[in-house]
């Protein structure tokens, strides 16, 4: 298992970016971070290197800043970067990383959970499975009840709530569209702590999946919106990926 930090110019973001990676061979996984973190947190706060080595998978950890992994009106195309440019760059840098759907997985926590599911629902042909830990999946809910950042912050990314609903950033609209079109979706894994203030986001998404008959693995466990919870909850998903090797 090799660890490396890559620096390259991103056409989507029009600047130099850095990506951390653990790389063995054969399999690939993407980990997206939360709103107040960066690309180093997975390796600093979890046992992801050991878990990935045991599973025999590569782990790619990009920095999404505070973008909600969205193409912003300011010109920074974070979603394009995460979902298109980054995978292409990784297969170019590492011979052992496969572009095949069955070899690619994506996971994230909080804001990153939203980003992971958006990538999986927008480009279901690219991922075998997607995992959201304590995901900020219901953006109107975040507008109304999660005031840590304030409404102006969410508006700067998504526009108004009225603009957001039904847009390409709306996970529930994407899920409905995919279900109605009979799209073969990646396997979906959701997990959230019972003391987490944004638990309603995961519950609502789970119920929507059930309503459309979409298979989903759902876990509620004791815990809050913190690394003590995420450190444990990412392990089953990594083991799942390893079982597919």
Predicted regions span which residues?
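Non-catalytic cap/lid and distal C-terminal segments of serine-dependent acyl enzymes
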Residues: 1-245
